[in-house]
């Protein structure tokens, strides 16, 4: 299985366009040793030719341009994208579909709850019908697994995650299973397994069992501290309120990951305020000590 990190930052990217926190300002003036990052998205393939896009970031055009296999050049109009999986209906994970309209129709896999949001509160399915048929919905059921025909050797097993629907959703304050999912993806030839959950607010025993079954854990790296937005002076909400488990502190992501010594551990969906973006920070050194990696745009993993 080929895993390509197209974007590794949380919403707004890094540096965020309107932010002057210590990280963003430091990156711009050159005092911070860090890499710029676009908004979270990955691509999966079983042959390096046909790719499944997991979430469609607002930065999708730049991400595709930066990854040569996404333009195989087999015809006058071509793309390496064979299918799209949406893990939720958040704006940061779906607005890229608008930039892919020239390539419609697209095969899109998502849950019923995500499809409902994208047909009502943010009606991308309706809007894109006007471009060569738009988006063809393939329902993700929360029980069992599914295979995408273009990548027949990859088996996708979805699982619900505790999280709120987007602010625009008609059921914003009435959460349902399927608002947000993670994926366990297995290459049935090699046996390699990826656990992918960029929005992970809590790890219970059922999730821990899936994590133990994986070779690589690509998980939520949004915030170092739960009150990070408040500490940095850029917001009032905590990580938990936004559905993200912070790395630091009792019960935090680093403590959780200590329970998986045999797995490769990679943090993704990193907020612009997170000190781990500073490659010289003590927080980054702590990740190195714990053998936890930080995803970056262009990172490649094979399982």
UniProtKB/Swiss-Prot annotation:
Keywords, sorted A to Z: PQQ biosynthesis, Transport
Pathway where it operates: Cofactor biosynthesis; pyrroloquinoline quinone biosynthesis
Domain of life of the native organism: Bacteria
GO biological process, any: pyrroloquinoline quinone biosynthetic process
Record InterPro entries: Metallo-B-lactamas (IPR001279), PQQ_synth_PqqB (IPR011842), RibonucZ/Hydroxyglut_hydro (IPR036866)
Record-linked Pfam families: Lactamase_B_2 (PF12706)
Gene3D superfamilies named among the record's database cross-references: Ribonuclease Z/Hydroxyacylglutathione hydrolase-like
HAMAP family: PQQ_syn_PqqB
UniProt xrefs under NCBIfam families: PQQ_syn_pqqB
Family label: Belongs to the PqqB family.
Entry function: May be involved in the transport of PQQ or its precursor to the periplasm.
PANTHER family, alphabetized: COENZYME PQQ SYNTHESIS PROTEIN B, HYDROLASE C777.06C-RELATED-RELATED
Protein name: Coenzyme PQQ synthesis protein B
Lineage, highest ranks first: Bacteria, Pseudomonadati, Pseudomonadota, Gammaproteobacteria, Pseudomonadales
């Amino acid at each position: 299985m080929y895993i390509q990190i197209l974007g590794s930052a949380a919403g707004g990217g890094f540096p965020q366009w309107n932010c002057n926190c210590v990280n963003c300002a430091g990156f711009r003036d050159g005092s911070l040793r860090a890499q710029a990052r676009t908004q979270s998205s990955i691509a999966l393939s079983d042959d390096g030719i046909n790719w499944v896009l997991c979430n469609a970031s607002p930065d999708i055009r730049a991400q595709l341009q930066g990854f040569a296999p996404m333009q195989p050049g087999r015809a006058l109009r071509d793309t390496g994208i064979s299918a799209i999986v949406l893990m939720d209906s958040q704006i940061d994970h779906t607005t890229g579909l608008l930039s892919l309209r020239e390539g419609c129709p697209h095969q899109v896999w998502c849950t019923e709850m995500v499809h409902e949001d994208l047909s009502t509160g943010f009606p991308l399915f309706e809007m894109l019908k006007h471009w060569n048929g738009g988006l063809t919905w393939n329902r993700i059921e929360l029980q069992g697994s599914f295979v995408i025909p273009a990548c027949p050797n990859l088996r996708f097993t979805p699982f619900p995650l505790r999280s709120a629907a987007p602010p625009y959703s008609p059921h914003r304050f009435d959460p349902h299973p399927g608002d947000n999912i993670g994926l366990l993806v297995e290459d049935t030839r090699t046996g390699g397994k990826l656990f992918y959950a960029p929005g992970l607010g809590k790890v219970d025993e059922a999730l821990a069992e899936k994590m133990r079954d994986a070779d690589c854990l690509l998980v939520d790296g949004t915030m170092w501290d739960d009150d990070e937005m408040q500490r940095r002076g850029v917001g009032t909400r905590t990580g938990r309120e936004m559905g993200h488990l912070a790395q630091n502190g009792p019960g935090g992501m680093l403590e959780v990951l200590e329970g998986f010594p045999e797995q490769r551990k990679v943090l993704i969906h990193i907020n612009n305020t997170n000190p781990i973006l500073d490659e010289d920070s003590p927080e980054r050194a702590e990740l190195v000590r714990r053998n936890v990696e930080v995803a970056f745009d262009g990172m490649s993993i094979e399982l």
